[in-house]
Amino acid sequence: GFEMDFENLEAGFKSGVKLMILCNPHNPVGRVWSREDLQRVVELANRYGVIVVCDEIHADFNMGERRQTRILALEHAQENCVMLASATKSFNLAGLRQSSCIIANPELRGKVAGEMEKAHVAPNIFGAIAQRAAYEHGDEWMDAVVEYIRENRDWALAYIRENIPEIRV
């Protein structure tokens, strides 16, 4: 399986890397990082002064193999972690161009807000209302979507195993 290479990650951080973009779950393989792996990333990032931007946009599609841990729920993650989330993938709201950038550290949040203002990035009120409605009232929809995707995945895996045994999945 796909594993995080912590030795290489630390070497990169030591070399002066200032920002890490992490997908959780990983896209495209769908791997949900363990709480322990994420905690280790946070600890290394704090040690070397690296900001971790954790893209959690696919978190709603967790197939249940491992419980999703949100990066900001981890000890000391609030110091240098940014969490990105959105209902655009889960609820097909991409046209509303809505997402959330959650930053617990007030100093870092201020820097990001300043850069967003310079770039004329402003909240989208229609998107914000739609995203809120999706997360407050969309559980039944999301459950059905996840089940549909799971069935498609299972069908594809069975087909490949039966008809294309040269491909290992």
Locate the predicted segments by residue:
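Conserved core segment of the aminotransferase class I/II
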Residues: 74, 79-150, 159
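Structural signal for well-ordered, non-membrane alpha-helices
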Residues: 49, 150-153, 157
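Conserved PLP-binding catalytic core of the aspartate aminotransferase-like
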Residues: 149-150, 163-169
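Alpha-helical scaffolding segments of alpha/beta enzyme cores, especially the outer helices
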Residues: 36-43, 107, 155-158
